[in-house]
Regions:
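Conserved N-terminal/central alpha/beta ligand/cofactor-binding core
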Residues: 1-12, 261-268, 272, 291
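Conserved, well-structured core domains of diverse proteins
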Residues: 1-92, 99-100, 306-331
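Active-site-facing alpha/beta catalytic cores
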Residues: 71, 77-166
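Conserved phosphate/anionic-ligand binding catalytic regions in large, soluble enzymes, centered on
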Residues: 82, 86-94, 167, 237, ...
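Generic secondary-structure signature for well-ordered alpha-helical cores
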Residues: 95, 99, 169, 200, ...
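A structural signal for short, well-ordered beta-strand segments and their strand-loop junctions
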Residues: 101-103, 241, 299
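Glycine-rich phosphate/ribose-binding loops and adjacent secondary-structure elements
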Residues: 128-272, 276
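Catalytic or ion-coupling anion/metal-binding cores of large enzyme and transporter domains
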Residues: 256-265, 273-332
């Protein structure tokens, strides 16, 4: 418009009308809440700003019991049935980055392996720890090794009260909050919407019992990036689980309800892809913590976050931008 003759009113009017055409609503009715709706409050609005060039930001985490410390607060799942080359490449990447794995079988030596235990996958004594579905918890955990890290996978809000009570009474180390039922069936991650409300609901349930620090919370479902990880850690998770994002980095291609792997990728290329993704996500999560004035990723808290949609405020228990609180009574 700046280059148009200012006296040419018809042309200016036509150009303006084109620019004023209504666009599609980015938040239509029924839109599912997303982690993209969450924003971090910059440190200069809430506290003293750290010097990102001089002050390091630690991101390592211990899941509990005597498990080795994870260099990155990440776990990976969903690779039990992929081609052998993909498994080996993933194992090498996990060794390089210090990331753990959740699955029925070990895919590499010298990694934190949390074994998925069910009717067809008995506990392996070489596993770092075990996770069982809530439906099998009472049966499987009565015979577990009491000195091993043990967790319960829960995916439905109506199960959480009983699961939390059982976990506290049985000295369970962790609750795996499976927001898409993807720990047991990776294909669900392509067909279901993530239930981010599992995390704030569990934190609230533990807080009511004054047991918030007694159980490690690990969230799985819809995690794509380091920013997603930082937001979930701020909401109360100690670690997050990647599935589809890592599969794509390893050469996977989404095919409706499954992921197929390109056959022209070498093992080195797959390893490099997964390693780059995990390291980039670690740096991104650290960056978000630094922006909020924290020198440790796990010092992030819900007060560092705001959301920009009412549906996300309701689901995630985070205040809407411009407000101070949110009513959690409607959750569940």
């Amino acid at each position: 418009m700046a280059q148009t003759n200012p006296l040419d009113g018809d042309k200016h009017r036509a150009m303006l009308q084109r620019r004023l055409q209504p666009r599609d609503n980015p938040f239509p009715e029924g839109r599912w809440p997303s982690l993209d709706d969450i924003v971090c409050i910059p440190a200069n609005l809430s506290r003293l700003v750290i010097d990102p060039y001089r002050e390091a930001c630690s991101i390592d985490v211990s899941l509990g019991r005597d498990t080795p410390t994870l260099q990155l607060p990440f776990l990976v799942s969903g690779f039990d049935t992929v081609p052998e080359q993909v498994q080996k490449a993933l194992g090498r990447a996990l060794q390089t980055t210090g990331t753990g794995y959740i699955g029925k079988q070990r895919i590499a030596d010298n990694i934190v392996w949390i074994q998925w235990v069910d009717d067809v996958s008995p506990a392996d004594p070489v596993a770092t720890g075990y996770v069982v579905p809530w439906s099998r918890a009472a049966q499987c955990l009565t015979v577990r090794q009491h000195d091993a890290f043990t967790g319960i996978s829960v995916s439905r809000l109506e199960e959480f009260e009983d699961a939390v009570e059982f976990a506290l009474a049985s000295n369970i180390d962790a609750l795996f909050l499976d927001g898409m039922d993807g720990l047991s069936d990776p294909g669900n991650a392509l067909s279901q919407q993530p239930r981010f409300d599992l995390l704030p609901y569990t934190v609230s349930t533990l807080r009511r019992r004054r047991q918030e620090e007694q159980i490690t919370l690990i969230y799985a479902g819809g995690v794509r990036s380091g920013t997603d990880a930082a937001k979930l850690i701020a909401m109360g998770a100690s670690a997050v689980v990647y599935g589809v994002a890592v599969a794509l980095a390893a050469g996977g291609m989404i095919n409706t309800t499954s992921i197929d792997y390109a056959t022209d990728w070498s093992m080195d290329e797959r390893t490099a892809g997964v390693t780059a993704l995990l390291q980039a996500n670690a740096g991104e999560a650290s960056m978000m913590a630094r922006c909020t004035g924290k020198t440790r990723l796990h010092n992030l808290e819900p007060e560092d976050l705001r959301v920009v949609t009412l549906s996300s405020a309701d689901m995630m228990g985070i205040p809407l931008a411009g407000t101070r609180g949110v009513d959690l009574s409607s959750q569940g």
